[in-house]
Amino acid sequence: MSALTRRHFLSTLTLAPAVVLGSGREAQAQTRLRVLLNSDFSSVNTWFTLADDRGFFRDAGLTLDYTAGRGAYTAAGRAAAEGFDVAYGDVNALVEEVARANAQAPVAVYMMFNRSPSVIAVPAGSPIRTPADLAGRHVRGHATDVALQTFPVLAAAHRLDASRVRITTSEAGMGALVTGMLAGECDGTFGYDSTITAALLTAGVPVERVRFLPYATLTPDLYGSALMVSRRLAREQPAVVHALVRAVNRGVAAVAADAGAALAATKRRVPAMHEPAERARLEHTLRGDMGHPEGRRLGIGAVDDARFARGLAALCRAKALPRVPAAADVFDAAFAVPAADRIASLAGA
């Protein structure tokens, strides 16, 4: 129920008051939470907006005040520095915060992306077919892009000397980065599969003009975006965290069941959104980033403990972080919804 301002998402509807009237009975107190999103409102965080529109957070006794994010990799650090109750963003950035012993780092409580969404896009006719082919090439991306930030893991996994890859950063939009690559400005572009696909559609460029080197297969132990909460909230108000996780899970189930309703929820907040691009972006997210086969066994929200531990250890080694934290220090499974309530329908082969 929230719309974008320059700094904050405040409600397109009136924000719920501190006390909301029940259905003819006693008033229900609402807990207000400050939430940092991965970006502005889009199809890839629409489980929040659809959950708001359908009253899932209200039913859980919660009112969410949203703040626009600056990219998934910045969410964990900003949540720690700015005191957010809740954040949604990349779990690998959270690993970095915990590995550096940041006492204010949040903790993940619901794993949204059970695959890494990151890719390196290259022109369809490029000779780059494997990570080894990146040696001597120029790859460009946003400084805080998840693919760029986790590239050391990919390089280490494939014994590629990362220093042999020329990496530059740019503040240009993703559409400009990819079309610039196609014009010969660089050999590859860091990004998400879904984001690059949406950028191409928005720019009117055939998606077939690019190919992807997908981290999901090249660094299979890495996870992606997760719901995080402050450690103080988890410690002092665990019932609130349980309620939040249940409501978000209901939102994910609603999005998976009705993508059209999810896109409509986004459009109500971003009337100028490019609908075909956002539809493709959501489809890539649901079937790709949330489609790991383990989802059939675990459902969305949970992690495979051994895989998660391998992935965070690989990240810490590749980025020479001060320590390798225990998986439980990064992801707290105590707040998981019951297995029977988790969404397993997105799992791929």
Language model regions located:
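N-terminal secretory signal peptides and thylakoid transit peptides that target proteins
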Residues: 1-17
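Cleavable N-terminal signal peptides
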Residues: 16, 26-27
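N-terminal signal peptide c-region/cleavage motif recognized by signal peptidases
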Residues: 22-24
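Short, glycine-/small- and polar/acidic-enriched structural segments
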Residues: 29-183, 187-194, 213-215, 220-221
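Short glycine- and hydrophobic/aromatic-rich loop-to-beta-strand nucleating segment
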Residues: 119-121, 226-229, 233
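Extracytoplasmic/periplasmic substrate-binding proteins
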Residues: 197-216
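Secondary-structure end/capping motifs
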Residues: 236-318
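Conserved C-terminal helix/tail region of periplasmic/extracytoplasmic solute-binding proteins
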Residues: 308-349
